[in-house]
Amino acid sequence: MNVVVIGGAGFIGSHLVDRLLSHDHTVDVIDDLSTGSLANLADARAVGGGLKIHHLDATSTEADSLIGMRRPDVIHVLTTLPPSDQPPAAHARALQVVLAVLEAARRHGVGKVVVAVPATALHGHPTSRALPLKDVDIGQLVPRGVRGVVARASVDLLVAFRDLHAIEFTALAMATVYGPRQRADGGVVGAFVHAATNASAPVIDGDGRQTRDLLYVDDAVDALARAGERGGGLLVNVGTGVQTSVGELWNRIAALVPGASDLLALHGPARSDELARFAISPVRARIHLAWSPWTDLDDGLTRLVEG
């Protein structure tokens, strides 16, 4: 299979590239390297053969021409949604990438587009709903904040292009993904590991009792790879269904790094857009992607710290 990965030099994208190459697919990476790094693709480049890397803006005419030349079976879009407090241009950029990819897919006859978006943005604030959150149909989504609206709009674009141009899609609502190659500023797990391994005090927003659904990157990539061939027309939760508090997460990471348990966490004010509790149920993923998470949190954190 011929696959294009938008954002393939990033944290999750580079792991997806490794997975696709290991299954003998041909992969073209399109990445502007604004947040990604060629170092993330060192293993993939060593494999050689089926990989080509293109330092391009995904919205450029050059990227469109490349997609037209390659005519991939699947395009994976792994772009980063900015925090809600970022300037409007940053949010517009995220939508421009999805729209540009869909337009290229329409023009060049691409069969399927897979987009991953943060579940925390897409599902809003589940204050009165039972956790873990069940899968919902796209029309039932009620996102909150600018980031959530952008995530929802990305999924709406997929639906529109499927209805108008018969371009198949699968949208994955991803839990909080962690693992090797994660940047220190790429989320709470990366920040805590950086603090622990550099003997610096971790910073916790609020009291640390807020919870997240933590998904190891290999598990996330397995779902992405499966979505390339399954789950057409669906929005699918990809998570563990298990809540872990931010405070407990720090304690688990600190226990893996000598001396880190002696570090005293610094508590800052709670963020205005902070979710109090969050976890998602992957029932639809089990049914339609034949996927379930398999990496225990302690095992995943150990691999991250030791790797």
Question: Which positions does each model-derived feature cover?
Answer:
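N-terminal Rossmann-like NAD(P)+-binding domain of SDR-like oxidoreductases, especially those catalyzing
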Residues: 1-177
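Residue-level signature of the cytosolic catalytic core of signaling kinases
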Residues: 59, 129, 142, 150, ...
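NAD(P)-dependent short-chain dehydrogenase/reductase
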Residues: 127-130, 134, 148, 152-212, ...
